């Protein structure tokens, strides 16, 4: 019940055309409520770089869809829906897709119906592009689809995404504890569309926020 795929000390792996149906679950219904760990679907550890997940289906997982702790990994053209339906025992910031590595790319993915308040924690110097996202953060308050915390803002590139019909912020460059003076800086966010969302939240200095369309907020 720990994970469906666990990549350890491995580089240049490609996971393609895989279907993960109901891939993770705890033993709560069996009365076991301790020592379960987090029921994530796929994990890349900090020593796993230059891997790719492409054209896969992730649906009805109790925990996160993916955890990425390595660098230069790519998540491309996947379909995620009904992810982290319990929003419990998630790692770190508690998001649906969790990245802490450097220079990872999340592109051309479709996401809908998620539980955790924030959908994607991108990692440092990330690229988040050409994604379509809706109906997120159903079990928790606050949050955003793209959740850029202080450490994850610099050199991030957020562009050509369509986020719609969610109560959360579409894109967020945040600061710890709400202290705007501690916010990350030097992020780039351009050519995105947010329709019927909570809009954008941009903190920090020296950000480039250009050519975004925000309607029906």
Model-identified regions with their sequence ranges:
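Extracellular beta-strand/beta-solenoid scaffold signature
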Residues: 1-6, 29-45, 60-67, 88-98, ...
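Composition- and surface-driven signal marking solvent-exposed, interaction-prone regions
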Residues: 3-8, 203-205
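Right-handed parallel beta-helix
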Residues: 11-24, 48-63, 71-86, 100-117, ...
């Amino acid at each position: 019940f720990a994970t469906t795929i666990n990549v350890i000390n491995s580089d240049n792996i490609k996971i393609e055309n895989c279907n993960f149906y109901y891939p993770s679950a705890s033993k709560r219904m069996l009365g076991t409520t301790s020592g379960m760990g987090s029921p994530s679907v796929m994990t890349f550890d900090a020593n796993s770089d230059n891997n790719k997940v492409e054209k896969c289906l992730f649906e009805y997982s109790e925990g996160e869809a993916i955890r990425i702790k390595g660098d230069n990994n790519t998540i491309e053209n996947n379909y995620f829906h009904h992810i982290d339906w319990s929003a419990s025992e998630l790692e770190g910031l508690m998001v649906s897709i969790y990245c802490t590595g450097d220079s990872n790319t999340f592109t051309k993915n479709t996401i809908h119906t998620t539980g955790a308040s924030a959908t994607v924690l991108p990692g440092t110097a990330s690229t988040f592009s050409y994604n379509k996202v809706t109906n997120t953060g159903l079990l928790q308050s606050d949050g955003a689809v793209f959740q850029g915390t202080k450490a994850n803002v610099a050199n991030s590139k957020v562009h050509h995404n369509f986020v719609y019909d969610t109560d959360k912020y579409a894109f967020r460059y945040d600061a710890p504890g709400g202290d705007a003076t501690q916010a990350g800086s030097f992020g780039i966010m351009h050519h995105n569309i947010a329709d019927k969302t909570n809009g954008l939240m941009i903190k920090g200095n020296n950000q480039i926020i250009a050519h975004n369309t925000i309607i029906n907020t």
